[in-house]
From Swiss-Prot:
It comes from Geobacillus stearothermophilus (Bacillus stearothermophilus). InterPro entries: Cyclic_Pdiesterase (IPR009097), Phosphoesterase_HXTX (IPR014051), RNA_CPDase (IPR004175). A motif (HXTX 2) lies at residues 129-132. The lineage of its organism: Bacteria, Bacillati, Bacillota, Bacilli, Bacillales. Gene3D superfamilies: Cyclic phosphodiesterase (3.90.1140.10). This is RNA 2',3'-cyclic phosphodiesterase.
Length: 314
């Protein structure tokens, strides 16, 4: 059975991808590399994991969510070109980024978290780059000096999240988003910013789609963990601000969350329920996929409730 490879990376914005793609299109006519990377596959690798057994998926996602929760969003600037491999026959042609302390710190935290989970990682020093082409196949040796005359892409882009990708070698583009983790830290070093950060989770929750469904119990536990972390941050900030919590506030309904999650896991494990007429069973029967959709929308509805807004599905 063919195993999938996974990695944690910084994604690029559409604008940054387009800038590199335009450069790539121009450069490919004069630089005979065998493969030019698809625009949607541009990224900055933080940790290459290789295979991720099902039992490690939930701990990995929890660890990445924790790292992201304490990291503040930042910006990067495209700058410079370079190669890896032999000087005259490089195996990688890359676009660089300007030195950024926030990126180095994020990579350090991601790397250490992955090591603590037992992943075997590349020990070489971190060299942030975006691979744009592979394998020199020119008849003449590659001339590094030629890069100086190329009009490299130049733009600044935001980094609001880190992503767990899976490699699909038989597809184009070949890197598939498995989970995205929003950077929720505040610039002053605090973890989270109360409701504003909670609402960010609403914007990202729809990212947890297709392939995470293969690890449904782990996925459900991850959602429970994220909810508990967000709730704890919000309550801590409420307490720090000296706000008085009235009985019956919106947090009260969260006390039943553990039993709700357990019921949902149980329903998923039982599989599709038999069809019944409306008189015998007013509640709709749910397939496993429908139950997972319920999970996603329930999480969204909970966030809407915390805002004091009617529940709604975006």
């Amino acid at each position: 059975m063919k195993r999938s490879h996974y990695f944690i990376a910084v994604p690029l914005t559409s604008e940054a991808k387009q800038a590199i793609s335009r450069f790539s299109g121009d450069a490919s006519s004069s630089l005979p590399f065998r493969t030019w990377v698809h625009e949607e596959d541009y990224h900055i690798t933080l940790a290459f994991l290789g295979d991720v057994p099902p039992g490690k998926m939930a701990p990995l996602c929890e660890a990445m969510a924790a790292v992201a929760a304490k990291s503040a969003p930042f910006s990067l600037a495209l700058a410079g070109l370079g190669t890896f491999g032999e000087r005259t026959a490089p195996r990688i042609f890359w676009q660089g980024v300007k030195e950024e302390a926030a990126l180095n710190e994020l990579r350090r935290d991601v790397y250490e978290a992955c090591l603590s989970l037992g992943f075997s990682l590349d020990r070489r020093p971190f060299a942030p780059h975006i691979t744009i082409a592979r394998k020199w196949q020119g008849e003449a040796p590659f001339q590094p000096e030629a890069l100086r005359s190329l009009p490299a892409a130049s733009t600044v882009f935001s980094v609001p999240e880190i992503v767990l990708y899976r490699t699909n070698m038989e597809k184009t583009p070949k890197y598939e988003t498995i989970a995205a983790f929003p950077l929720l830290g505040a610039p002053d070093g605090r973890t989270g910013e109360g409701m504003g950060q909670l609402l960010k989770l609403r914007d990202y929750i729809s990212r947890y789609e297709t392939d995470v469904y293969h690890y449904v119990p782990e996925f459900i536990r991850l959602k429970q963990w994220q909810w508990e972390q967000a709730k704890a941050r919000w309550e801590a900030e409420r307490d720090a601000d000296g706000a008085r919590r009235e009985p019956g506030e919106t947090w009260d309904f969260l006390l039943d969350k553990p039993s709700w999650w357990e019921r949902l896991i149980g329903r998923w494990r039982r599989g599709p329920e038999p069809e019944m007429d409306e008189e015998r069973s007013p509640a709709p029967s749910l397939s496993r996929a429908a139950t997972l959709d319920e999970l996603k929308w329930q999480f969204l509805d909970d966030l809407f409730e915390l805002q004091g807004m009617p529940a709604g599905r975006l």
